[in-house]
Amino acid sequence: MGRKWANIVAKKTAKDGATSKVYAKFGVEIYVAAKQGEPDPELNTALKFVIDRAKQAQVPKHVIDKAIDKAKGNTDETFVEGRYEGFGPNGSMIIVDTLTSNVNRTAANVRAAYGKNGGNMGAAGSVSYLFDKKGVIVFKGDDADSIFELLLEADVDVDDVEAEDGSITVYTAPTDLHKAILALRESGISEFQVTELEMIPQSEVTLEGDDLAVFEKLVDALEADDDVQKVYHNVADV
């Protein structure tokens, strides 16, 4: 599983990096986190979390600094979170999380991306009840038992700890992700491949041939929208 999450980040970074969309999306997320609290990551846990994720995605320091500087200024641009759920081919399900300054524009764009690429946008809640929100942390290591005990001693609500191919993957309750990261840092672990809040499907489907091609095109179209921050789905190995 550790390799899976690290591969997802690597694929997304490689794909988004060609157009720098990942920089712009993290820029917005950093701006919002800094604007809603202190523009200092040492005083703002949410901001520090976003910056750590940005670094994992290889976002340059100047992009991070620019977003924080913007939040320190007189700019009063307002961003609103949104969620759009829908369906792709052959049992595939998708959740799209957005952060936008224009809800009407974003809703229209996401609906069009679904409709023009073999998908259908559903009602709120039509898909998300089949996913579980969890914190996911991935770092190098092989002793899952000691990590599990360490987190329990730190009073972290741990769902599971897995070790595979030299990586450890920790699943936590979403409210305890920050606490888990802090406990791991205090134990001497300083580098993480993944620290994310994820919507994890309760079961996965496997797509092949034309269905897989349609699904990948649909996900690409959704991720290409500047207002889309995260796309979750239930398709295995994508």
Swiss-Prot record:
GO biological process: regulation of DNA-templated transcription
SUPFAM superfamilies found in the cross-reference section: YebC-like
Tree of life domain: Bacteria
Gene Ontology molecular function: any one: DNA binding
GO CC annotations on file: cytosol
Predominant cellular place of this UniProt entry's protein: cytoplasm
Keyword annotations: Cytoplasm, DNA-binding, Transcription, Transcription regulation
One Pfam match: Transcrip_reg
InterPro entries xref list: Integrase-like_N, TACO1_YebC-like_2nd/3rd_dom, TACO1_YebC_N, Transcrip_reg_TACO1-like, Transcrip_reg_TACO1-like_dom3, Transcrip_reg_TACO1_YeeN, YebC-like
Cellular compartments annotated: Cytoplasm
Similarity comment: family membership: Belongs to the TACO1 family. YeeN subfamily.
HAMAP family, sorted: Transcrip_reg_TACO1, Transcrip_reg_TACO1_YeeN
Protein name according to UniProt: Probable transcriptional regulatory protein Sez_1681
Originating species: Streptococcus equi subsp. zooepidemicus (strain MGCS10565)
